[in-house]
């Protein structure tokens, strides 16, 4: 039986939060009881420190809040909640939203257009999400909007802009950059060979180093079996940075399931 941290708290608010139900999503079932307990402790603190702001009529209940907090804290389970400093609000639309985008082309001309976004992470501002894509982040598919945006926040701790290199020791930067760009090249080669829809990794990862880090962070936590075999050196760097090994968790869970199945009479 898990000794859940909220069960020993005197606070009625903490006791009322549906953490056990929130943990029931497929993405979190590979965690050990100890990891789940630690994750809930971080998520409780996250909800105390951050403000979740529903927009455009979206209804935010306690279960949704708990699951959002758990997904935010999964990448920093071993790093610590202080890695999520730098923002205080999470804005949540009910669905993908339209924003005005401004960009400069190769010859210096500035263009303006309206585009549909799933999420945004401002360096000195809030994280913006949408509930439809948050729901799609509960499974183990390789897609996770919250982890993607958290990865951008972790990335910018290393400098003024997202570069694809998180805050790691200086001696490791060159190796990280080498392996990250090699992964981008391999992903692009696969796209050219089989097309975007058939590629094993989301094509967005090949667009730019910062997006590669964010996309591969999604796969690291939600589809490690697709990330690790294709990019073993970069996988080890991610394990070292996040101080977690989701593939080992997956194998442990599969072994447990296999053992249980063979002992059913």
Curated annotation (Swiss-Prot):
Gene Ontology terms: cellular component: cytosol
Keyword list, A-Z: Aminopeptidase, Cytoplasm, Hydrolase, Metal-binding, Metalloprotease, Protease, Zinc
Disulphide linkage map: none
Gene3D superfamilies recorded: Collagenase (Catalytic Domain), Glucose-regulated metallo-peptidase M90, N-terminal domain
Location in or out of the cell: Cytoplasm
Summary of the function given for this chain in its UniProt record: Involved in the modulation of the activity of the glucose-phosphotransferase system (glucose-PTS). Interacts with the transcriptional repressor Mlc, preventing its interaction with DNA and leading to the modulation of expression of genes regulated by Mlc, including ptsG, which encodes the PTS system glucose-specific EIICB component. Shows zinc-dependent metallopeptidase activity.
Protein name per Swiss-Prot or TrEMBL: Mlc titration factor A
Upper taxonomic lineage: Bacteria, Pseudomonadati, Pseudomonadota, Gammaproteobacteria, Enterobacterales
Gene: mtfA
